[in-house]
Amino acid sequence: MEEKNRVGKKEDRIMGINNGTGQQHPKIFLSGSIRGGRQLLEIYRLMYDSLEEAGADVLSWHVADPGLEENESKMTEQEIYARDIGLLTKSDALIAEVTVPSIGVGYEICRALVRKIPVLCLHRPEAAVSAMVLGNPDPSLEVRTYSDKVALKEIIVEFALAL
């Protein structure tokens, strides 16, 4: 998912503006395991595509990029942190895939909740999801299980359209 394949100017997408119409779209921070394992890359790509189809602007599209590791190898830890936190603070909501445990994903979820940004956590039924997610009573947090790609897409679209 290279930048050249994305529609519209990067600046407009970050501001949530739809290609000259001026219409605002929800800005979503997509969160998924990177260093903890990329075995769900296909799921992250489906999540990205589903959000785009629903009219959302995915600010952290790099999570679904198969070339992410190569691109991030050229960045410092500080640059990665600044990019991700900068995008998170511009987001209307965070959607996290939490099947694969990730300290970074947990950190992003916590930062979003502290900022009162709505969070949707998604996981497969067999996942051993942290009690810090499953037991969290924060009203801004929603945790859902999905059994297949169709269910995943339905949950994501429903959440995005409700923003």
Curated annotation (Swiss-Prot):
Assembly and binders = Monomer and homodimer.
Q: List the disulfide bonds.
A: none
Q: What is this protein called?
A: Putative 2'-deoxynucleoside 5'-phosphate N-hydrolase 1
Q: Which family does it belong to?
A: Belongs to the 2'-deoxynucleoside 5'-phosphate N-hydrolase 1 family.
Q: Does the keyword rRNA-binding apply?
A: no
- Give the highest taxon in the source lineage: Archaea
Asked whether the keyword Hydrolase is assigned, the reply is yes
> What organism is listed for this UniProt entry?
Methanosarcina acetivorans (strain ATCC 35395 / DSM 2834 / JCM 12185 / C2A)
Q: GO molecular-function annotation terms?
A: 5-hydroxymethyl-dUMP N-hydrolase activity
GO annotation terms (biological process): deoxyribonucleoside monophosphate catabolic process; nucleoside metabolic process; nucleotide metabolic process
Report TM segments: none
Q: What is its EC number?
A: 3.2.2.-
One matching Pfam family, short form?
Nuc_deoxyrib_tr
Residues noted as binding substrate in the record, renumbered to the chain: F29, L30, S31, G32, S33, I34, R35, Y44, H62, E108, S130, A131, M132
Functional note:
Catalyzes the cleavage of the N-glycosidic bond of deoxyribonucleoside 5'-monophosphates to yield deoxyribose 5-phosphate and a purine or pyrimidine base.
Q: Which Gene3D superfamilies match?
A: 3.40.50.450
